[in-house]
Every structure is written in C-alpha cells, then in structure tokens.
C-alpha cells in the first residue's frame, strides 16, 4: 500500500510538471488598440492580444472570443452579443468584431482564449470592456452646440493667413473665455454607470461637482473645424452623488480662434468660431432606465478668469475674477446668462487618438537674477511644457512668466526664433498660497523669465508676490512607450535622448514641427520619421488621426496640403510640396506594414489615389518641378530651400515611390486595373527620371549629392547595373567631406537607410560620432538638450525639432538589428541583424512589437560575441550572426548542430543566418 501511494505521488508530480511545462497565456488584451476604451466609434471594433509561453517555438493555432452586454454572462461562458466559436487561425491582431449590431453609448464586455501549436488550450482571460461612442450624428439629439457669444459672419477666416497684416479685419470685440454650468438632480435610484460625451472647442476642461474629470490636457484633439470636430468620452460614475449634481465646463481658444491681439505672438490668423461646446451625459440606473443631460440654452454661462487664451501667444489668468464654488451644488447663478444655441458645423467623431497629458515634471536647477527684478529659472531640459506655479501675495498683484529655449547674451529669455512675444500671466487673489497651471496653451522651453515676483528666500523690499515653487511640466501625447535603447557609447546614448526629447515634445494632437513657433502638422516629418518614432512609441492611433486630418484637408483637385489639419493657406511650395503631401500615400501603407491593419488601406484608398492623380497632373514628361526639395540641407547658404540637390529630383522620386505604393495597395485590395495602370506609369517615370538626372559616366544622380544618390537608391530608381557605382559615390562624398553630413530634412532618412541596407553602418557611425562638424554631436557640444532645427544648432532656428531625428531608426534597426521583413506585416516575421561598429562593445535594444517584446542584447567580451535574443510568441525571426563559421557558435552552451529548434539557412555577406521561433536564445561566438 505504501509503495502504491509513493507511485501515485510520483505520477501526480510528473503530471503536474508536464502540465506546468505546457502553458500558453494571454497578455495585453486590446480593443481598438486600447485597454478598456471609451468612445469606440467603429461598429466593427478590432481585438488583439499578445501571448506568453514557457517553451520555445510556440505559435497560436486557434482562438475564441466572447462578447456580452453583461459581465455575469461572460463568467458563465455566454457571449450573448458575439461568440466567435473556435476559429482556426494564428492571427492575434486586428480581429474584427462580427456579432450582433452594437448600440451607441452601450458598454460591452469581452474575453478570449487560445490554442497553441501543440494543441494546448489556454484559460479564459480576465474580462475587459469597451464603451461605444455616439455612432450616428442623430444620437446627439437633443443636445445642442452652445456658446457665450458668436462671431459675425464677416469675421470668419479659414483657412487662415500667415502674418496676416491687413488681410484680416480687426474684431469689433475679441472672444472672452466662457465657463458653463449645468445643475441636475439624481433621485434615489442606484446609478449603474454615467458617461459624458463632450466636445468643447478649441479646448475644454470638464468638472463634476468641483473635481476635474480625467487627466487629459488640451482636449479635444485638433481638427479641421469646418469639416469635423472631436468629442471625448469620460466615465463619471464615481463623481456623481444623490441629489444635486453640477457639470462645469471651461473653454479656451486653441486653433478654433487665433486672437488678433498684435501685442502677442501669432503665427497665423484664423477664426472658425468663438469657443463653443456640446455635451450629452447618459446616466444608467441599475433598473435599466436612463437619464440624459443635454447641452442647450438652459445651461448657464459667464466669462471665466481666463482673460487671454492663444495657442500661439500664451495664457492669462486673473484669480480676482474667480467665483468660488461655481462648480459645486448650491451656487447662485442669477447673475449668469443663458447659453446661446448655435448651428452645427461639420460632423462629430470620437477622439480615438491618445490624448495629451502631463508626462513629467522638472524642478529648477538654478535661479538667477540676471537684471534687477528679473529672475531666470533654468529647468535643465528643453521640452514641450507648461508651468506649475505656487505663489503667495497681495490681491491684484500680477506675475508674468516668459518661457524660452535659450537666453540672450544679457541672460534674458530669448524667444526670437521660437515665436514672440509669448507669456503666461497670473493675477493673484490674495487668498493664501495659490496654485495655477495653464489649461489652454503650451510652449517649448527650458528657461522661464519671471517678472513681478521674487523666489522664496530672496529679499523683497517692495513686497512683491513670493514664488514658493515653480516647475516645468512636460506635456505630450500619451502614446504608449514601446522602445528602449542603451549602449556602451555615451555620446550615442546622449544622441538618443536628444532625439527622443524632440519626438516627445512634438507628439501633440498631431506630429508638430516644433512646440512653440508653429505647432503645425507639417507632414513630411510624419512619414520620414515614422519608423524612428514607432520604434519608441505606439503611434497607430495618432497616425490614424493624421490620415483623417489629411482627408479633411485634401482639396477637390486631390492636393494634400503640406500641413494637416490645414489652418493656414501658405503660399506656393509651402502648401504644395510632394515630399510633404506624400504622407497621404505613405502613412496608410506604413500603418498597414507596421501594425498589420489592412482596413487602414481600404479607408484611405481614395485619399491615396486622388493624390497621385493630382501629382500626375502636375508632371511635365513624367517629372515634377515644384516643392521645397531637400529642406534644410547643409549647403553654403543659410538653410531653407534645397541647396545641393535640384528641386525636381526629390519630388519626382517621391512621386515614383507613391505610384508603387498605390500599385501595391491596389493589388492587395483586388483592384487589378488600378494595379496595372499605376505600375505602368511608375515604369515610365523611372525611365524619365534616369534620363533627366543620371550621369552614367560619373555614376551619380544630379550633382552627386548625398540626398540625390541615396533617395534614388532607396526608391529603386537606380538600374541594377548602376547600384554599386551609385553607392560608392555616396560613400566617397561622405569620406571626402571628412564624414560630414550634407543631406537635409528629406534626404537624411534615405541616406541612413541605404547605408544600413548596404552594410555600411561603419560609415553611419563615423558620420555621427564627431562633435566638431554640424550634426548630433555638434548640437550636444553646443548644449542642446533636444534636437535642433538645423544641423549647426543655429540660434536663428528652433531648438526643438524632430525633423532630422532619423538616426533613431538606426539605433533599433542597425545597432539592435531589429528590422521588418519585407514579406510580412506587424513583425509577424522579422530580421535581427546587429551591427558592431566603432568603439561599441555592448548594446541592449528592446521593442515591444504588435506581437510582443523583441530584444537584442549583445556584448563583445574577451574577444567573444555574447548575444541574447528574445522572439515573441506567435512570431518567427531570421537572425544574422556576425560570423561565417558555424563551428564557432554555441546556443545555450550547445554547438549549433546539437540545437534542434534552430534552422540554419546559410550565409550572406559574412553572416550566418538562422531561422528561429519564439523564445529566448543565448548565442556565443568564439574568435
């Protein structure tokens, strides 16, 4: 009997160990690329998840999704809204909902389980939810757009004018910033949920019973307000109470209206309307009944303490105008007016892009009185930001705070090239310590010049207000970070930080060019920096919004303006440059390849085709001659228009690339006639391009610039027999210039990609490891903490631009070696090809791809190459190890011939190539 018990115990232990070794788990469940999203606008939302396993080479073989309108049903295994059944598929991304019709404003719950390639079934996941938005415009009824005051028709201006001067009439009366109030009663019924659907233009802050709702900044996102506006969805269940409740809404101008006050900075003048709002709150009770609170002329309105609001000029707040308790029940509103109902303009859609938020705070590293009564706070980092002020002083005292990227020779705030004059001002109420943050404007800065107050601890004979604390609050788009990079070379770590700060500072509601002077969505950066940004941040939602902005800004003739949303009708090439407008073609394709969502191509096809047809109409014998060219290349003159490359070359190369992208999209979508048309047209453009720009006896394009040759190679415009000579010309030009960069905004991205692609990362290293010539190292030496607009860090240009940050892509794709596979999407299959260059002896690079984390960590130690690779579950990688000798390689301590789950594919360019499935791999290459 004792022997039997021992036997059974051993058997149970073996069974337990076996089951533990065969597990598949589900992590990072997402609906519409978000965790528990609010305001889902699609009637067929997409689901996704990532997998984890405790064995290598594991894939998904099937999945099942359940969706219910009650979480209790899901607990019982019932999907009364959708039960997908067991679907044989290895797809874990972009699974489209296919159940019963979804209702506006309704909340749904979902869970999923999977089977892996061994037949092992996972447990059901935890329950997640998604809240639908208002799917149809009539779902807003009876809510109305309301305002405090309206703009006379004669004063509406959109798109606006840059440096408008006398093009725009002065306003009879400038917009005042309103605050709205709505009180409502909730009886004794128990509240199940309460959701607010709200748009306040230009920007709004919502409060419920005196508490701000959410942690967003500058809601809603920017849009082309004559075509569309965005609304935001908030769950306010926990903010409500029995009895009287109060909704409070404050509005600022944003891009809806640029004040015409000539004493403050204005990049442009435009007026779509004065601030306005619309709101619907739906309260659902446990008995199934609902109550809606809708905006209308029964809402109360009065001017707010925000006395000036400009996205370009700053923000003023007068605390003496505060009405204490206005957001709380019981407040007397007899002195307030009824809101004015106004007509609807454009359509409303949900803000599904990530909002802006306060992401990081900085304390001052020094405070100096550079002139009597003027104090400079240095926060040590140039960033897109607002200030956070704590101050104490007398009623009516006023403090002015001027942000700046750098200082004048006299030690004062220098805004000459970042948009001036810009300031924040605060007028004190005199009620103890006062705390204020701007709500409706931000700037790019490192320094703040303070006038009218003194720092705590400073002698104060005039009795000025005392600043108890002043911080810099970095504001940015809340897109999820997905990348990490560190290496043994400190200069390159600093360059990574330099570029990353410029990316974060320009990830706003659009990808801006700079966070101060313009704050506009100049489109060339969006496609040229796409991979550089996407390695660091999940930008699927942000870029999907950019595509919508381009659709709403596209002209009837197909032209996509250089900026989207288009707020100003810039002249000539500044409105119509193919290197910029091509984002309308390239971004949908990029999103499909990076994130695997083919619906982006379907939804963008008209945008793409209309634009290439427009470009075709502008050609002369298949060549384009308009545009800005290789903007800010490094030539003999002050940077601006292309200096070293004929301006017809880059737009024609871009046009050729666009044609090929549209052709590939046409084929993918089954549009065969379009595929043939654009393929044939591309072939004609290639012939014309080479006839126009290629000098065969010299082996280069145009005048032989880095940009001309690199973009021609990357776009496959170079004939096969000429590729080698063209590459040699690029490298020769770089070496002749002592490894100097000349390529600009358009060309540098393609220069790096071509050099990496052709195995010349040593050249990339040499170009970017020096500090005595204009480039990244030079900018660091000049004291830059974010990437500057010009290679030479000119003080006549912005010091926070991400348009030249393309080296970020090489950090991941070169040093880390993480590269997309041309035949795959969303990193389902990918390449790992690490580059050991210069004085690098280690690097650790990680990227949380759509399927999971890819990690490439290597070290050269004692002449050995020690390499750790992580491949996500449900994916495959092709690893290029830097040796031709298989016998010198071990994995997990075993010779490669003894490793059964790794497939040897051969060699290429002194590399051994292996195909691996998911899991962790530990390689050592002996000398």
Walk through the language-model features, giving the residues of each.
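Bacterial Sec-dependent N-terminal signal peptides
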Residues: 1-25
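Non-catalytic C-terminal accessory modules of carbohydrate-active enzymes
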Residues: 269, 273-282, 292-330, 349-361, ...
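C-terminal capping/lid segments that line or modulate ligand- or cofactor-binding pockets
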Residues: 247, 317-318, 518, 536, ...
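Alpha-helix capping and helix-loop boundary segments enriched in small/acidic/polar residues
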Residues: 168-175, 195, 213, 221-225, ...
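Active-site acid/base region of carbohydrate-active enzymes
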Residues: 203, 294-303, 447, 455-498, ...
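Alpha-helical support elements that line or immediately flank enzyme active sites
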Residues: 194-198, 208, 386-405, 440, ...
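Extracellular/oxidizing-compartment recognition motifs
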Residues: 23-107, 111-517, 524-525, 541-542, ...
